[in-house]
């Protein structure tokens, strides 16, 4: 699929049919995550790739409100490494350091979701969760801070694209404008 087509046809998936994902596809998705741009090449992320069916099925309620994820074959818990976060905060100040680490994670998440879509899979980015319950449920290291959960799998039906605001409403030019019509 051409990149522009991928961008225009990717959508969040919240209904899956259980089909295992090939190991090489899982590796390709995770590899896309580590290729994301990041602050000063600190690579502040760490990913937990969860394929254990029981852990996935029991994640609803224990981690986040995701009842629709019971049939997903892969959950990726995206974490920020505390040691790197602390270094970013020391070097750039607390607010900027945290923002850099969160932006790093967001870039990795976006890369992984796009790669999953490129492989014909669907995915969803799940935000805030109970961090302590997430760490306990998935066995996450004490010095890793969960920041998002991705569900990845085969869509139960073609994903529904949602409307977007017109480009002209989402952009303000500073300088010579470009016709966005």
Residue spans for each PLM region:
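C-terminal helix-cap and adjacent tail motif
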Residues: 3-13, 25, 148-181
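Helix-loop element at the rim of GNAT/NAT acetyltransferase active sites that forms part
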Residues: 9, 35-36
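A short beta-loop-alpha structural element at the N-terminal edge
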Residues: 19-24
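A structural motif
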Residues: 26-34
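Small-aliphatic-rich amphipathic alpha-helix that forms the alpha element of a beta-alpha
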Residues: 33-34, 76, 94-137
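Glycine/small-residue-rich phosphate/adenosyl-binding loop
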Residues: 38-108
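A glycine-rich helix N-cap at a beta->alpha junction
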Residues: 67-75, 139-161
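Short secondary-structure boundary segments
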Residues: 80, 128, 154
